[in-house]
Amino acid sequence: MAISKLHLLFLLSVFLSLHPLVLSDTADEEDVLLTGINSYRASLNLTTLIHNHNAECLADEIADQFKNQPCTNTTGSASVPGTTPGFPNLPNLLSKCRLNPTVTRDGAILPACVPNLDPSLVLTNFTMSQYSKDLNDSKFTGIGIGSDDNWIVVVLTTSTPEGSYSPASNSGAFAFGVNGLVSSSLMFLLFCFFMF
């Protein structure tokens, strides 16, 4: 009986370590938008977009930059092309996410401001606006979504080296390797402890 409880505890710890708990409404809004965008693309016979953690990091950073900016008809998807404020500190934001500008050239950054981030309005802001051109483009294969306050940002990635949003080779790879090694080692040790 004690062994079965240990196995149950082990399985529970594996489940919790592999599936981080979602503790905020923001993640839910982002998940709803991702599902909506992928359904929209499926209706156009396009491939679904795959979650890209690096693009999500950049989307989060950009949304954070916009959070104190009010929604107007000159911001986000309602703006006239070319009038949306640029990202003057983009190099700093890329650095925070361990990204090199050369791996983001083919990507697209799509900010939208929607009061209270109403899910149906958020999806409409991407699928029924100037952003639909990017969502309809088959070159995009990945997506990262970030939000803060009334702002939600979608970053689209490609499978090309210039749009993959791969981390900079001198910093991101080591950090990923160390974290992956520690997690894998811990799980292996727990497995051995409970099985033998």
UniProtKB/Swiss-Prot annotation:
Residues 1-24 form the signal peptide. GO terms for cellular component: plasma membrane; plastid; side of membrane. Keywords: Cell membrane, Glycoprotein, GPI-anchor, Lipoprotein, Membrane, Signal. A lipid is attached at S171 (GPI-anchor amidated serine). Glycans are attached at N45, N73, N125, N136. It is a lipid-anchor; GPI-anchor. Residues 172-196 form a propeptide. Belongs to the UPF0277 family. This is Uncharacterized GPI-anchored protein At5g19250. It comes from Arabidopsis thaliana.
